[in-house]
Design a protein with these regions (language model features):
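Oxyanion-binding "anion nests"
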Residues: 192-244
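N-terminal Rossmann-like NAD(P) cofactor-binding subdomain of oxidoreductases
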Residues: 1-192, 232-234, 267, 284, ...
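Short acidic/glycine-rich loop or secondary-structure boundary segments that cap or lie
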Residues: 159-162, 209-212, 244-247, 262-263
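Helix-loop-beta segment of a Rossmann-like dinucleotide-binding subdomain
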Residues: 117-124, 200-211, 315-317
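A glycine-rich, Thr/Ser-enriched phosphate-binding loop motif common to dinucleotide/cofactor-binding enzymes
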Residues: 123-132, 212-221, 325-329
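General structural feature for long, well-ordered alpha-helical segments within catalytic domains
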Residues: 11, 19, 136, 197, ...
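C-terminal active-site/capping subdomain that shapes the small-molecule cofactor and substrate pocket
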Residues: 232-343
Length: 343
């Protein structure tokens, strides 16, 4: 089997570090590996599978002779992804730059793997919240087409990067010392006001748009429709930042075309790849972010019918947004390309 030459862009960041961990854990096959980052991080030494690599500054020519390029995200994708694709690399991009481009497949491998090979050089990784929700939606959608989704997210501070974790830690220290909590980052760096996230909930992730939904919320709308190949699905999201380090949680109410029993949905979830059913109210068994952190599978529980609508189904789903919500999803796409020898 041919093994690809692989580049990781953003190797020194949180998602880049997760790429490296997962490549080692999953024995991802590669011929040569190149680690890339900004000029500021170039020169850093990183070890992968026992071999030390020096991180290079990312430039267009960095992608010469690269088969698969894993982009950890960020604004640099917009300029470097087309350059890498032009040089023959298949780019798997974790940024939002190309997600809604009709020429670019938006892929969750358990949900729409058939879209991977339709790429024209770039494949987009969806938003972390969309990926996690889609793993709960797909088994239900296969039983009866989804008409409407109402979702509230409980998103960990690490979704805002390591600065989000540091801000939460500092605020907890300030609060316990009786000091005023300082906030410089959340709900979003570009906002005119910032609020403490410690002992608090922030019902804003990213900037507000003209319709009073946030950019994060509208990502969930459009991306869900694209992944499930149905623009008629109504998605009504509220995204909330919570004082949790890692793993996003989501409360989801779905209306399907026909009624689906709890038993049928649970059975479908149990067979669905990447999903673990943790659902036993009598034993207080349900998914929690503390226990899904650093694991590959998402967990689904609190599965129950809508009290008033026979076509309605409620569930609670939790997943590690750095793993399945970012690095793992991208690496699974790369694994698919290797399996099909399509690079």
């Amino acid at each position: 089997m041919k093994r690809p030459n692989v580049a990781i862009l953003g190797a020194t960041g949180a998602v880049g570090a997760e790429f490296i961990t997962l490549i080692e854990e999953r024995n991802f096959p590669y011929e040569n590996l190149k680690l890339l980052a900004s000029a500021r991080s170039a020169g850093t030494e990183l070890t992968v599978n026992g071999k030390t690599y020096i991180v290079e500054e990312a430039k267009p020519e960095s992608f010469d002779n690269i088969d698969i390029a894993l982009f950890a995200g960020g604004s640099i994708s917009k300029t470097l992804a087309p350059e890498a694709a032009k040089r023959g690399a298949i780019v798997i991009d974790n940024s939002s730059a190309f997600r809604m481009d009709p020429e670019v497949p938006l892929v969750v491998p358990e949900v729409n793997p058939e879209d991977i090979l339709k790429h024209k050089g770039i494949i987009a990784n969806p938003n972390c919240s969309t990926i996690i929700m889609s793993l709960g939606l797909k088994p239900l959608h296969d039983l009866s087409p989804i008409k409407r989704v109402v979702v509230s997210t409980y998103q960990a501070v690490s979704g805002a990067g390591k600065e989000g974790i540091e801000e939460l830690e500092n605020q907890v220290k300030q609060y316990t010392a009786g000091e005023e909590m300082t906030a410089n980052l959340l709900p979003t760096g570009s906002a005119p006001k910032h609020y403490p996230v410690a002992f608090n909930l922030l019902p804003q992730i990213d900037v507000f748009l003209e319709n009073d939904y946030t950019k994060e919320e509208m990502k969930m709308v459009y991306e869900t429709q694209k992944i499930l190949h149905d623009e008629t699905i109504q998605v009504v999201p509220t995204t909330v930042r919570v004082p949790v380090y890692r793993s996003h949680s989501e409360s989801v109410l779905v209306e399907t075309a026909e009624p689906v029993s709890v038993e049928a949905f649970k059975a479908a979830c149990e067979k669905f790849p990447g999903l673990q059913v943790k659902d036993n109210p009598a034993e207080q068994i349900y998914p929690m972010p503390l226990y899904t952190s650093n694991q590959n599978d998402c967990e689904i529980g609190r599965i129950r019918k809508d009290l008033y609508n026979d076509n309605g189904m409620n569930f609670w789903i939790v997943g590690d947004q750095v793993r399945k919500g970012a690095a793992l999803n991208a690496l699974q796409i790369a694994e698919y390309l290797v399996e099909k020898q399509a690079f």
